[in-house]
Amino acid sequence: MKINSHYTDLSTHYLFHDIDLRVNEYLAHHPGEHLLRMGVGDVTRPLPPVIVEAMCSAAEELEHEDTFRGYGPENGYEWLQQCIIDHDFKPRGIEFQPDEIFIGEGAGSDLGNLSELFASDNTVAIPDPTYPAYVDANMMAGRKIVLLPCLKENNFVPERPEEKVDIIYLCFPNNPTGAVLTHEQLRLWVDYARNNHSIIIFDAAYEAYISSPDTPHSIYEIEGAKEVAVEVHSFSKSAGFTSVRCGYTVVPYDTGLQAMWMRRQCTKYNGTAYVSQRAAQATYTPEGRAAVNANVAYYMETAQMIRQGLQEAGLQVFGGINAPYIWCATPNGMGSWDFFDLLLNRCKTICTPGVGFGPSGEGYVRFSAFSHREDVLRALERIHTDLSL
């Protein structure tokens, strides 16, 4: 028996596991201390009543023989696929067939599993810093990875690689930097992919947070993108589905990958829970849209509080305008983990070290607007009074 040796190339611990180790060590020496958590990007607001009601109604259907449902379609129920098309794409002049919309358990799974469609000798371009799963999934397959630095000097927008790459990961609005692309910037990436016969995996998990008019909500707003792009969406950060688990991935026929992804899902995925899909459908009702918009507005209000509070404390910040993340430069050239430790020990506040997202994240930390509002206000007060920059 031989194991996949590429797993030995992975970091021993996942970023958030390393954070937990440091936090637990701190708490072991300071039992009972209340820490203010502004790091991990899990949501904190409860599910809107309209979504809970839809889930309860769906669960009650399963109690009765005449409405009971077993396995559903591997790629999702057509009523949800059509709902997504009608609300997320048609208003932007984008047309899809239901079979091009694949309902899944969330963006994270599909972003990792999509790599199974591609040979291991492909070259993959990934922005740096980035969501760690992009790198890990491709390291597991033994692919060559080209990192694209996202720096203050390029407004945290990666330059197109000079060499030909086969697979490109893009996430906008970006996690962790909060950066966004204009239509023109995204068009250049689509043109690159078309000219080089590449595929773009576009992570649109934070699309609901876009407010700027020149920021595209979907890569398919760009002409020709259906030929070269797969787009991944999530209900987690907009509707609070981090425990409900539901998202969707668009695999256009024109990419040549739709049949492959369908075959993969039929073999390895038995479909998303009926109750979760009814919950997702409820987000598109008028009451559901209002609830989602209220969630987004609440978190973005928190983001503005964080931006303003950090700036008043003398820190330089980016993002937090079209995304729920604030990318904060560490003071005086301090390392990411050093600043993490300083905030933990002096302000009892937890952030996310930027270097955990990649080498170009060194010298930054990430703050999350998904944090509890009370924790945010107390943390900002402590940073302002106790940090002494």
Where are these regions (language model features)?
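Helix C-cap/helix->beta junction micro-motif
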Residues: 30, 141, 195-196, 313, ...
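Conserved core of the PLP fold type I
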Residues: 66-193, 208-212, 216-222
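Conserved core segment of the aminotransferase class I/II
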Residues: 222-300, 304-308, 386-387
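Hydrophobic residues in well-ordered beta-strands that form the structural core
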Residues: 126, 147, 202, 351-353
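PLP-dependent enzyme catalytic core of the Aspartate aminotransferase-like
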Residues: 86, 90, 125, 333, ...
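Conserved glycine-rich beta-strand-loop-beta hairpin in the small C-terminal domain of fold type I
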Residues: 281, 296-307, 317-329, 361
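N-terminal small-domain helix-loop-helix segment of the aminotransferase-like
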Residues: 2, 6-105, 283-286, 389
